């Protein structure tokens, strides 16, 4: 849910322009609030026809929603063109929706861009809760993300962190005074892990029939991750006015379908290459191999599930770890506290995943980062398919629902000084075990994130090793660079840091 962006043919511009002009005339007479049903959530005043779209034009809806929550409360209604949307901004109400009222609100409501990019919900994360969802979630947990499967990939995760540290050491040795770009190093190794898990091999290049040439690993990453994340936030104004769906929006369609076609061509090439290795007896156990053996999926479903596995670690895990290292570099006292905890528990031994349960402050750093920098600020919209109640309010069938995790985690009634990054709020026994997951970064209930265990392993082990090995300091002037971009809370300004070897051995 982004800004109202008219586009496409002149007819579209004229039609929408007329609506906006009418709305502007109405605005002169006073802002008009949506008609309120008895016992309905509070409604944010908007304009005729377009509702509240003009108030979301900054493309940071999670922040706007949080500001409205301070005025209208944790649950309220807005209008986005023809649609009525209930926005939830508190942990209590969000959990009621995701757990207690799950049966009434389990259907995903995707934008036109996401519908195209996910091939109409052909993924674990975006599918409706149905037999298909249960089946494919079982597949990914059994073969890649569950407890047993994670043990299988332990050596690869350890090697990933080792490779990153080796690169950091080399960069520091080559130029001790130059800041390094954290994301460049972390991104490459995460993508390597994703490819090995998904495809059985760290693919350096692949021949794509549609392109008529080999493409590099960087091009593979751009086609399957970067371009897709940017395209996912493309706005089709017809989503808000379905009765105008007949009007062309050529600029949107060209961008989205070109990106999707390119992704499909690259994924087909990667899958074809792995199938050829299987025939030659050279393939290693991986997610694709598991899915092929199950023999229950169409070619399209197979491609989408492998693509989902490819981007799962390569995006949100990067986002969380980069923000954690940003905050530790910005707050040297908290970085020192974490380092001393690691020293007390590990001594001169290298910190490993086995040490993680004995590092409570590291755990606090992780959860506070998830709270302050929610990897996915807005949970993808859901569709209320039967009349229900939320927080005592009546919510009719046909309503869309958005959970604003950013708003939940910045709610002053639930968190003290929420704008500050304070790991201590999760440390020292101040919260019960269940409260550690109050941030809802991994969702809740039957739609909880399948990749939560792997994300925790990677982020916590990486942060611990990075702090054990180096002292971290921000590049001068970067202390307040907290803007985000893309569908996830991707840091707009990549983290630039100065590293100092600790010389622990």
UniProtKB/Swiss-Prot annotation:
It is found in: Membrane. Its cofactor is heme. It is an enzyme of class 1 (oxidoreductase). Disruption phenotype: Semi-dwarf phenotype. One of its GO terms (biological process) is ent-kaurene oxidation to kaurenoic acid. Heme binds at residue 449. It catalyses: ent-kaur-16-ene + 3 reduced [NADPH--hemoprotein reductase] + 3 O2 = ent-kaur-16-en-19-oate + 3 oxidized [NADPH--hemoprotein reductase] + 4 H2O + 4 H(+). One of its GO terms (cellular component) is chloroplast outer membrane. SUPFAM superfamilies: Cytochrome P450. GO terms for molecular function: ent-kaurene oxidase activity; heme binding; iron ion binding; oxidoreductase activity, acting on paired donors, with incorporation or reduction of molecular oxygen, NAD(P)H as one donor, and incorporation of one atom of oxygen. The keyword Oxidoreductase applies. Belongs to the cytochrome P450 family. Catalyzes three successive oxidations of the 4-methyl group of ent-kaurene giving kaurenoic acid, a key step in gibberellins (GAs) biosynthesis. GAs, which are involved many processes, including stem elongation, play a central role in plant development. This is Ent-kaurene oxidase 2. It comes from Oryza sativa subsp. japonica.
């Amino acid at each position: 849910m982004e800004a109202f962006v008219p586009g496409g043919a002149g007819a579209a511009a004229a039609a929408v322009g007329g609506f906006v002009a009418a709305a502007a005339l109405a605005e002169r007479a006073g802002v008009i609030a949506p008609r309120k049903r008895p016992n309905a959530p509070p409604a944010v005043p908007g304009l005729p026809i377009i509702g509240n779209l003009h108030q979301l034009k900054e493309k940071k809806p999670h922040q706007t929603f949080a500001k409205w929550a301070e005025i209208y409360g944790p649950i309220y209604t807005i209008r986005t063109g023809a649609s009525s949307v209930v926005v939830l901004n508190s942990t209590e109400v969000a959990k009621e929706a995701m757990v207690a009222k799950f049966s009434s609100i389990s259907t995903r409501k995707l934008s036109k861009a996401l519908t195209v990019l996910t091939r109409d919900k052909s993924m674990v994360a975006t599918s409706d809760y149905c037999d298909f969802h249960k089946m494919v979630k079982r597949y990914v947990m059994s073969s890649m993300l569950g407890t047993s499967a994670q043990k299988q990939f332990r050596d690869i995760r350890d090697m990933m962190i080792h490779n990153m540290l080796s690169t950091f050491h080399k960069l520091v040795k080559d130029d001790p005074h130059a800041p390094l770009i954290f994301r460049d190093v972390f991104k490459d190794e995460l993508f390597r892990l994703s490819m090995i898990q998904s495809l059985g091999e760290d693919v350096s290049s692949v021949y794509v029939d549609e392109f008529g040439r080999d493409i590099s690993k960087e091009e593979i990453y751009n086609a399957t991750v970067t371009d897709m994340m940017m395209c996912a936030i493309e706005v089709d104004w017809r989503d808000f006015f379905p009765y105008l769906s007949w009007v062309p929006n050529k600029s949107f369609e060209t961008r989205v379908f070109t990106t999707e076609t390119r992704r499909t061509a690259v994924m087909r090439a990667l899958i074809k290459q792995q199938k050829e290795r299987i025939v030659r007896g050279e393939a290693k156990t991986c997610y694709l191999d598991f899915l092929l053996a199950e023999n229950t999926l169409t070619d399209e479903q197979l491609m989408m599930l492998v693509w989902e596995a490819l981007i799962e670690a390569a995006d949100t895990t990067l986002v969380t770890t980069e923000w954690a290292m940003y905050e530790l570099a910005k707050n040297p006292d908290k970085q020192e506290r974490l380092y001393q905890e690691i020293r007390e528990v590990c001594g001169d031994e290298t910190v490993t995943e086995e040490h993680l349960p004995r590092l409570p402050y590291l755990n606090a750093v992780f959860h506070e980062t998830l709270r302050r920098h929610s990897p996915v600020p807005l949970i993808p919209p859901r569709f209320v398919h039967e009349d229900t109640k939320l927080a005592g309010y009546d919510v009719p069938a046909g309503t869309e629902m958005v959970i604003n995790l950013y708003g939940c985690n910045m709610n002053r009634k639930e968190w003290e000084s929420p704008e500050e990054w304070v790991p201590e709020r999760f440390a020292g026994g101040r919260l019960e075990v269940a409260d550690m997951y109050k941030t809802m970064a991994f969702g809740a209930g039957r739609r909880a994130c399948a990749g939560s265990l792997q994300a925790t392993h990677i982020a916590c082990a990486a942060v611990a090793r990075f702090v054990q090995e180096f002292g971290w300091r921000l590049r001068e002037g970067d202390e307040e660079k907290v803007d985000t971009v893309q569908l996830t809370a991707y840091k707009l300004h990549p983290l630039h840091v100065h590293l100092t070897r600790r010389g622990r051995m």
